[in-house]
A protein has these predicted regions:
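C-terminal alpha-helical cap of glycosyltransferases
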Residues: 101-120
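A short, well-ordered alpha-helix in the C-terminal region of glycosyltransferases
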Residues: 84-98, 110
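Short hydrophobic beta-strand element within catalytic cores of glycosyltransferases
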Residues: 42-45
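Conserved acidic donor-binding segment of nucleotide-sugar-dependent glycosyltransferases
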Residues: 57-58, 62-69, 78-83
Length: 120
């Protein structure tokens, strides 16, 4: 495990990582978590309202009690010992793709059409 200073060039770090840990005490949407999944990284995240909403019933992520360092360490150890990474990576990429800008724009476009023209 390594902790790095802030950088805008995160792609290289994602490429050399095996898991992504989001240990926030508060989080808005969690776009960085979606970006990590788009790079095939399974996620260990604080159990926050947004992470619970985004990751419920997802096989490529686990939630730990916010602030519970022992539980976080246990999940990190568990994930480090896993050998079935490929399916988790594929699931992460597949799920992150649902947040692709084109799909989000299409969803908004469809919603706005329903609002403007009524439900058909």
């Amino acid at each position: 495990m390594a902790l790095h200073p802030f950088t805008k060039e995160v792609q290289e770090y994602y490429a050399h990582s095996s898991i992504y840990v989001l240990s926030s005490r508060w989080e808005g949407f969690g776009l960085v978590m979606i970006e990590a999944m788009a790079h095939g990284l399974p996620v260990i995240a604080s159990d926050l309202p947004i992470t619970r909403e985004l990751l419920k019933d997802k096989d490529m992520a686990v939630l730990f009690e916010t602030g519970n360092i022992a539980q976080l360490a246990g999940y990190m150890s568990y994930m480090a010992d896993r050998t079935d990474w490929e399916w988790m990576e594929n699931k992460a990429v597949e799920y992150a793709d649902t947040f692709h800008i084109e799909k989000v724009c299409d969803s908004w476009n469809n919603l706005l059409k329903k609002v403007v023209y009524g439900t058909r």
